[in-house]
């Protein structure tokens, strides 16, 4: 008995103490991702509300036998007519419970709740709640590796892009400086996400210990997540100021952009951390089942909407200028805006889809895959659109590649010509030694001719002649 009590979690102890817990449930799910205190509070709250409801509800006009309202340890059940089966959705107390599945409780023909034949106690069928646990675990692992691959690809592409921007000095300008900061924020976000997924979210023992370090890492993760979107906002503000406000003025003070991109996301991240510690202090703040996350998501959605407004206004101004003046400069700015205009909806579509998660198991799984691709492959998307598809970057890379080919080809042709001339000279010298040709012929064949050949080759306009 002592060993049993030591092994049971507080949630398990509470459930066992309840009068109608299903003794036939062989597996009691252990929630490793939520704080057990939070789970226990949910059950206690549901039990309190159930007993209040039982006392307040009036008795219905009973015609025939009826199973009385009751609390079974996890859910509250209303009065049910004899011979009927009552249903409701599975509770969300545990990580491996699927809230889209149904719990059933049978009211027998004699007006009593169904008794399990083995235990002879009232029994509620919760078996469907974790029926797909193994499939859910497989899906969770697939999503885990999908996220790791996405951030790995994002990290690689972003570092290559930053290398291009720093190496080629001809690309240096204020807009590229903003690109560098945007890319760097995505690099940091990918690094902290990989650390979070491998060292925290995948470590049940660490989550159970709930050290302060894992909450600090979650704070940094949410802060960098906000930096991504506010640097996107900086891109939109810069283009709007450059094209609409300053009328193609070139220089702007970047200090305000640094404050907005790196400084402002600290505010919602700090407010979220304080609120989370007081109102939903689960282990490592790993749960997403709290409205406190709107403290983070709200400013991000506002930044996306403001950015979209700026970009649409920029397009309107540029189209007007192109119709009136047909300036080539306006056309160039339109190309610069197009990349940002494409990227903002792509980065923001996850927040459009977020409130509309479907209820079904299969449709919910498809939704999870789509959301993971949208969230964890953003760095790859940003690097591709802002760097690899950038006309300026492509032009610089093409010019340097052509210069390298010409330089390499010239060096190769020069060394080939030298080898050819050396081979000709050595061959004639061998002939000279074998046949003892006179000095006049030796001058013509052994020295003069190869020298002329070598000179003509080295002076040729075609390096591959």
From Swiss-Prot:
Topological domain ranges for the Cytoplasmic compartment: 167-177, 241-254, 317-331, 390-465
Q: Which GO terms describe its molecular function?
A: adrenomedullin receptor activity; calcitonin gene-related peptide receptor activity; calcitonin receptor activity
List the transmembrane segments.
142-166, 178-200, 212-240, 255-275, 292-316, 332-353, 369-389
Disulfide linkages recorded for this protein, renumbered to the chain, are: 50-76, 67-107, 90-129
**Pfam families recorded:** 7tm_2, HRM
Record topological domains on the Extracellular side: 18-141, 201-211, 276-291, 354-368
CDD domains in UniProt: 7tmB1_calcitonin_R
User: Keyword set for this entry?
Assistant: Cell membrane, Disulfide bond, G-protein coupled receptor, Glycoprotein, Membrane, Receptor, Signal, Transducer, Transmembrane, Transmembrane helix
Membrane association type: Multi-pass membrane protein
The family classification in the record reads: Belongs to the G-protein coupled receptor 2 family.
Q: State the protein's purpose.
A: May function as G protein-coupled receptor for calcitonin-gene-related peptides and adrenomedullin. Specificity may be modulated by accessory proteins. May activate cAMP-dependent pathway.
The molecule here is called Calcitonin gene-related peptide type 1 receptor
Q: Which organism is it from?
A: Oncorhynchus gorbuscha
Tell me the organism's taxonomic lineage.
Eukaryota, Metazoa, Chordata, Craniata, Vertebrata
């Amino acid at each position: 008995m002592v060993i049993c009590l030591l092994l049971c979690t507080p949630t398990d102890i509470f459930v066992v103490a309840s009068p109608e817990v299903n003794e036939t449930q062989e597996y009691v799910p252990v929630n490793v991702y939520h704080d057990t205190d939070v789970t226990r509070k949910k059950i206690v709250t549901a039990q309190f509300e159930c007993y209040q409801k039982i006392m307040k509800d009036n008795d219905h006009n009973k015609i025939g036998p009826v199973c009385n309202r009751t609390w079974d340890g996890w859910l509250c059940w209303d009065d049910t007519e004899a011979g009927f089966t009552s249903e409701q959705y599975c509770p969300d107390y545990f990580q491996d419970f699927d809230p889209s599945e149904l719990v059933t409780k049978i009211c027998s023909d004699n007006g009593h709740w169904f008794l399990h034949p083995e235990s002879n106690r009232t029994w509620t069928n919760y078996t469907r709640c974790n029926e797909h646990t193994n499939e859910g675990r497989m899906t969770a692992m697939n999503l885990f590796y999908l996220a790791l691959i996405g951030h790995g690809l994002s990290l690689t592409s972003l570092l290559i892009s930053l290398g291009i921007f720093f190496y080629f000095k001809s690309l240096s300008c204020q807009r590229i400086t903003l690109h560098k900061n945007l890319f760097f924020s995505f690099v940091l976000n990918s690094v902290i996400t990989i650390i979070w997924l491998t060292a925290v979210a995948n470590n049940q023992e660490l989550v159970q210990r709930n050290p302060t370090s894992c909450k600090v890492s979650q704070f940094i993760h949410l802060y960098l997540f906000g930096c991504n979107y506010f640097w996107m906002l900086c891109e939109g503000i810069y283009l709007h100021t450059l094209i609409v406000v300053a009328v193609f003025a070139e220089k702007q003070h970047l200090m305000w952009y640094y404050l907005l991109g790196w400084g402002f996301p600290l505010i919602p991240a700090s407010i979220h951390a304080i609120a989370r510690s007081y109102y939903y202090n689960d282990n490592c703040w790993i749960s997403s089942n709290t409205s406190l996350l709107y403290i983070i998501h709200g400013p991000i959605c506002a930044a996306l909407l403001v950015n979209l407004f700026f970009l649409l206004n920029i397009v309107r101004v540029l189209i007007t200028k192109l119709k009136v003046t047909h300036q080539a400069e306006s056309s160039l700015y339109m190309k610069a805006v197009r990349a940002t205009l494409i990227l903002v909806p792509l980065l923001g579509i996850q927040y459009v889809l977020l409130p509309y998660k479907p209820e079904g198991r299969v449709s919910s799984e498809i939704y999870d895959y789509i959301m993971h691709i949208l969230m964890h492959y953003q760095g790859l998307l940003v690097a591709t659109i802002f760097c690899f598809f950038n006309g300026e970057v492509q032009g610089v890379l093409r010019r340097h590649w052509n210069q390298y080919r010409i330089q390499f080809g010239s060096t190769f042709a020069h060394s080939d010509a030298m080898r050819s001339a050396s081979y000709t000279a050595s061959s004639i010298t061998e002939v000279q030694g074998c046949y003892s040709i006179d000095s006049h012929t030796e001058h013509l064949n052994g020295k003069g001719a190869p020298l002329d050949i070598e000179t003509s080759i080295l002076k040729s306009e075609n390096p591959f002649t």
